[in-house]
C-alpha cells in the first residue's frame, strides 16, 4: 500500500505498552524482591527482580504490535481482495520469486538489527565480569537494574516516536530510487533525517532538563539519584540512536542492504574496545556502559553518513536539520525548567511536570515554525501533520 503509517503507529504503541508494563512489573517484582531480601539477608534480590520485571515490557510491547498488525491486516483484507480481482489480467510473480525477494530483503535487515542490539548483551557480560574482578560485585545488580530497567525505558520512547515519523517517508524514498529521480531521492533522504531530528533533539533536551521530575513521577518512593544522573548525562543517546536508526533505514531504502551490517559490525568492535577500557582502566562503572553506548550509536551515524554521501553524493543540510531544532530546544528547555520550578511549590510534582511538558511542546512548536525549521508542506507530510498545519494557520504562524 506504499505506506509506513501503520508501522509508525505500531512502534509508538509498542513503546507505550513497553513502558507501562515495565513500570508495573518492575514495581511488583521489586516489592517481591524486598521480601526475599529480608528472608536471605541481602539487598540485591529487589534490584534483580525489578530488572527482570522491566524486561517483561519488551515482550508485551512486541505482542501489542503484532496484534495491531493482525487487526490492520484483517481490516484491509477486503480492499486487498478487490485489488487482486482488478489485477487478475496482469501477470503474477511466482511464489519462488516472491520468497527469494523477501529473503534477500529481510535477512540483511535482521542481521543488521541483531548486531545493532547485541551491544546490550556485550555490555551485560563485560560489566558483570569486570566489575566482579574489580571487587565491585555488590553494585552490579542495582546499577544494571537502574540502567536497563529504568534509563532505557525513558530514552526508548522518544527514539521510537522520532523513528516512526521519519520511517513513514521511506516508501517515498524507495519509489524515488526506483524511478531514478535523483532530486526526489535527495529530498526524501533530507526529509527523513530532518523529521527524526525535529523530534529527537527536543526530546533529549526535555529529558535532561526534567530528569528529576520525570524520574520521581515514574518511580515514586525510590532513591532516583543514579537514574537522574544517567538520564541527564545520557540524554544525548536519544539523538544519536534516532539518527543511526533512520540512516540505517535510508541505506535500506536506497537498496544498500549490506552496508548497515558492515557499519554496525565496525561500530560494535569499537564499542567493545572502548567499553573494556572505560570499565577496566578508567573505573567508570555503569557510566562507562552509558557513554560507550552513546559512542556506539555515534559511530554508526558517522559511518552511515559517509556511506549515504558516497552512494548518492548527498550533502547533509545543517541549519534546518540540526541548528534550528537545537536553538528552539534550548529556549524550550529553559521555559520548561522555569515553569516547573514556579509551579512545583504550588501544585507538587505530578501537575507541575504535566504543565511544564505542555509548555515545552507549545514553545517548541511555535519557535520551530517561527525560525522556519519546517514549512507547511513538510509539516503536512508528517503523520498527523494536516491537523498541525491547520493549528499553525489558526495561530497565524503559517499562511
Question: Where is each model-derived feature located?
Answer:
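Interfacial segments at transmembrane-helix termini and the short loops linking adjacent helices
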Residues: 208-238
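Membrane-interface helix-loop junctions in multi-pass transport and translocation proteins
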Residues: 5, 16-67, 72, 258, ...
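Membrane-proximal transmembrane or re-entrant/amphipathic helices at the cytosolic face
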Residues: 338-399
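Helix-loop junctions and terminal segments of transmembrane helices
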Residues: 159-179
Amino acid at each position: 500500500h506504499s505506506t509506513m503509517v501503520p508501522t509508525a503507529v505500531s512502534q509508538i504503541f509498542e513503546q507505550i505498552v513497553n513502558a507501562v508494563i515495565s513500570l508495573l512489573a518492575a514495581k511488583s517484582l521489586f516489592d517481591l524482591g524486598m521480601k526475599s531480601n529480608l528472608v536471605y539477608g541481602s539487598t540485591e534480590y529487589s534490584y534483580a527482580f525489578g530488572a527482570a520485571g522491566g524486561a517483561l515490557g519488551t515482550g508485551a510491547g512486541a505482542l501489542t504490535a503484532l496484534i495491531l498488525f493482525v487487526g490492520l491486516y484483517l481490516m484491509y483484507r477486503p480492499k486487498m481482495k478487490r485489488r487482486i480481482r482488478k489485477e487478475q489480467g496482469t501477470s503474477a510473480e511466482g511464489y519462488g520469486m516472491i520468497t527469494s525477494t523477501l529473503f534477500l530483503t529481510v535477512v540483511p535487515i535482521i542481521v543488521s538489527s541483531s548486531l545493532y542490539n547485541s551491544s546490550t548483551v556485550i555490555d551485560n557480560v563485560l560489566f558483570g565480569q569486570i566489575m566482579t574482578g574489580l571487587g565491585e560485585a555488590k553494585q552490579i545488580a542495582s546499577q544494571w537494574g537502574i540502567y536497563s530497567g529504568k534509563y532505557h525505558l525513558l530514552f526508548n520512547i522518544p527514539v521510537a516516536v522520532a523513528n516512526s515519523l521519519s520511517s513513514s517517508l521511506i516508501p517515498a524514498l524507495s519509489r524515488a530510487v526506483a524511478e531514478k529521480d535523483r532530486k526526489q531521492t535527495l529530498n526524501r533522504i533530507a526529509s527523513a533525517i530532518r523529521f527524526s531530528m525535529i523530534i529527537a533533539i527536543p526530546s533529549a533536551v526535555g529529558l535532561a532538563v526534567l530528569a528529576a521530575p520525570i524520574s520521581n513521577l515514574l518511580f515514586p518512593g525510590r532513591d532516583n539519584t543514579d537514574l537522574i544522573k544517567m538520564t541527564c548525562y545520557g540524554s544525548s543517546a536519544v539523538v544519536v540512536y534516532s539518527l543511526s536508526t533512520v540512516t540505517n533505514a535510508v541505506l535500506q531504502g536506497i537498496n544498500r542492504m549490506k552496508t548497515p551490517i558492515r557499519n554496525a559490525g565496525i561500530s560494535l568492535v569499537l564499542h567493545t574496545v572502548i567499553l573494556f577500557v572505560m570499565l577496566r582502566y578508567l573505573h567508570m562503572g555503569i557510566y562507562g556502559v552509558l557513554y560507550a553506548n552513546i559512542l556506539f550509536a555515534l559511530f554508526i551515524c558517522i559511518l552511515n553518513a559517509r556511506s549515504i554521501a558516497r552512494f548518492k553524493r548527498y550533502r547533509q543540510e545543517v541549519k534546518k536539520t540540526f541548528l534550528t531544532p537545537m536553538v528552539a530546544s534550548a529556549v524550550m528547555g529553559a521555559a520548561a525548567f522555569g515553569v516547573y520550578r514556579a509551579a512545583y511549590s504550588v501544585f507538587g510534582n505530578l501537575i507541575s511536570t504535566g504543565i511544564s511538558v505542555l509548555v515545552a511542546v507549545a514553545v517548541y512548536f511555535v519557535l520551530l515554525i517561527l525560525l522556519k525549521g519546517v514549512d507547511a508542506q513538510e509539516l503536512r507530510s508528517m503523520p498527523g501533520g494536516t491537523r498541525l498545519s491547520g493549528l499553525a494557520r489558526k495561530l497565524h504562524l503559517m499562511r
